[in-house]
Each structure stands twice: as C-alpha cells, then as structure tokens.
Amino acid sequence: MNDTFMKEKPVLPLILSMAMPMVLSMLVNSLYNIIDSFFVAQISEEAMTALSLVYPVQNFINAVGIGFGVGINAVIAFYLGAGDNKKADQAATQGLVLAMIHGVVLTVCGITMMPAFLGMFTSSKTVIELGVHYSVIAFSFTLIIVVGVTFEKIFQAVGNMKTTMISLMCGCIINIVLDPVLIFGYGPFPEMGIEGAALATGIGQTLTLAIYLVVYFVRPIRVHICRQYILLSKKMVIKLYSIGIPATLNLALPSLLISALNAILAAYSEVYILVLGIYYKLQTFIYLPANGIVQGMRPLIGYNYGAGENKRVSQIYKIVLCMSGIIMVLGLSLIHISEPTR
C-alpha cells in the first residue's frame, strides 16, 4: 500500500478520510458500553456495582495497551515518513514483543490483586464475588487485547484505517449480540450472568484480533513483523517508551480518579458507585468520537514529521484541535438540553 498520500493529499480531506472510519467505530464501541451496562443491570444492582468497581482496572489495562500502542504508531509513522522501512519494521516487531510482555504481566497482576482491590471499596461479599468472577474471565483476555491494539496501531500507522474500522466494529457487534445470549442463556447457551458479559467481551476482542491477523497475512502492508528484530534494541525500546509512557499516563490517570471517587462514595452508599459507573459509560459516547479524530491524526503527524513537512504538521494539529473542540461543545450542549426540568 502506498502511504505517500499522507504528505501529498490536501490536509482537510486527508484528515476526514483518516478520522471518519475511526469515529464510526468509536461510536459503535461507545454504544456497546451503554448496551453492556443495560444488560448487566438486568441481573441485579450488585452486579452493576461490581462492574462499576472493576471498570477503572479494565480502563487501566486498556490505557497501558493503547498508550504503548500510541508509541508504536508514532515511531512507525515517523520512520515511514523518513523513508526508513527497516526501522519501521523494527519498531513494529519490538513493539509487539513488549506489548506481549505487558499483556502477561497485566493478566497475572489483575487476576491476583482483584479480590483485595474490590475489598477496598465494599464489604458486600456478593459484590466482591461477582466482581472477581467477572474480572477473572475479562482479564484472561488481556494478552489478546494488547496484541490486538498493537496491530490496530500498526495498521493505522500505514494509513489503513478501514481495516481498523471493520475489525473494531465486528468485535463490538458480536459483543452486543452475545451479551444477552450469554448473560441470560438462550438456545444451547447456559445462563452465565455477569460472567457471560465478560466472556462476550473477550470473544469480541478475539474476533477483532483474528481479523487483523487474517488481513495482515492475506493482504500484506508496508510494515512487517520480522524475526530478525525480535531481540530488543536499547535505542528502539527507549524511543517506544519515551512516547508510550506519557500516553499511558494520560490515559491511566482517569482510572485513578475513578477509583478515588469510588472510595469516597463507598462511605455513603454503593448506589453512588453504581451511578458514577453509569455516568462514565455514558461520557464515553461523547468522548470517543473525538478520540477517533485524534487516532486519525496520529499517523499523519508522525509521517509528516518524519518527512520534514513541519508546515503540514502544524496544519493537521490546528484542524484536529478545532474539530475535537466542536465535538466537545456539541456534547456539552446535548447534556444541558437533555437535563430534566426540576
């Protein structure tokens, strides 16, 4: 696939062509978050509270995967823009190796620490038990999640946003379909309750990764995973983490905020924790479209910076900043319009 269009195509049409597929997939993903909460709420109030308590940990795991993926994406795009394909391959390969290490560590830590973590916010044995059951299944798919995010960022780095859109949407749609089937038990499927919600999510994430792998092998892209680059290079590792760590912290800090708020609210009522969890799920419906635009921007910034097109970098940044601001203002207006009258 020829990626020179990232420095040749007019800026606004380029941003729209890169961002709109991601905006659409992010909207579907945010819709899933709301639907998932709706079905879990049908189980019991305790199940919804458990999901709200597990949510910041899930968000932290996603932050590590996505944040480091941003580093992979930026480094690959930079080297492609500079015309150094070998370095781009090295960044992709070593980024994948490091992401897999992150996945294994997060899986072990998440599953082993969850009972103690839940006990910090509630004394209800039912809520803790439901939270542990959900998290054991959900966190078992952590390695699949981080590898999937890595391939997502690799495809985005070469400008292949359609594959990313299709993969994410297919994963979300199968998730939405399987949620009621596995939670309540339809046809040959047993009733699994909150564990069914976790399994449905895991199956959706597995499908997303499977699509990436099929496309990668059937329709090769410009960047390749190469055995010769598996051994980690100190320079490349530093470059990946120098971008990945700040991005991870930026995404992970809200998880710490939610956990702190949960600890405060737990002193009053578990219902408050439930309401806060629902609010953050609804908030993503506004935030994720803006995030989709930013995801479309990242490879463009990296590619043009690597190619020395500093003027285009500035143009891209300013246009995306305006587009994101417009979405946030519209979201704020929508919230005020929908506020119930007292």
Describe the residue ranges of each PLM region.
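Short alpha-helical transmembrane segments in multi-pass integral membrane proteins
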Residues: 1-19, 76-143, 189-245, 301-342
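Generic alpha-helical transmembrane segments of integral inner-membrane proteins
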Residues: 23, 27, 31, 35, ...
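Signature of the first transmembrane helix
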Residues: 13-73, 77, 245-265
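Acidic, glycine-rich loop-and-beta core segments that form the ion-binding/anion-interacting portion
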Residues: 222-254, 261-267, 272-276
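Small-residue-rich hydrophobic transmembrane alpha-helices
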Residues: 48-108, 145-164, 262, 276-334
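Helix-terminus/linker motif at the lipid-water interface of multi-pass membrane proteins
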Residues: 27, 31-49, 118-125, 181-192, ...
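Hydrophobic alpha-helical transmembrane segments of integral membrane proteins
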Residues: 17-18, 176, 242-243, 285-286, ...
